[in-house]
Amino acid sequence: MPKMKTHRGSAKRFKKTGSGKLKRSHAYTSHLFANKSTKQKRKLRKSAIVSAGDFKRIKQQLANIK
């Protein structure tokens, strides 16, 4: 049986925290900032934790990430 490969796109987008959760960045942060409020832009700066529903699938893609 061949080894499970890490999904490289996912490896660039997610980081594992010390407690084993997955950190991600927010969407809507690349352009068109004039249409967004200061409050919205400030909230988008912080990273977020992957939700429980997505965690299992993403964890499989990151099989070899420590």
Curated annotation (Swiss-Prot):
Keyword Lipoprotein listed? The answer is: no
Which GO molecular function entries does the Swiss-Prot or TrEMBL record give? Answer: structural constituent of ribosome
Biased segments, Basic residues type: 1-26
Residue ranges that the Swiss-Prot or TrEMBL entry lists as coiled coil: none
Question: Which keywords accompany this UniProt record?
Answer: Ribonucleoprotein, Ribosomal protein
Q: Name one GO biological process term.
A: translation
* Region named Disordered: 1-42
UniProt-listed SUPFAM superfamilies: L35p-like
Q: Which domain of life is it from?
A: Bacteria
Q: Which GO terms describe its cellular component?
A: cytosolic large ribosomal subunit
Q: Which HAMAP family match?
A: Ribosomal_bL35
The UniProt family comment states:
Belongs to the bacterial ribosomal protein bL35 family.
Task: Specify the protein name.
Answer: Large ribosomal subunit protein bL35
Q: What is the lineage of its organism?
A: Bacteria, Bacillati, Bacillota, Bacilli, Bacillales
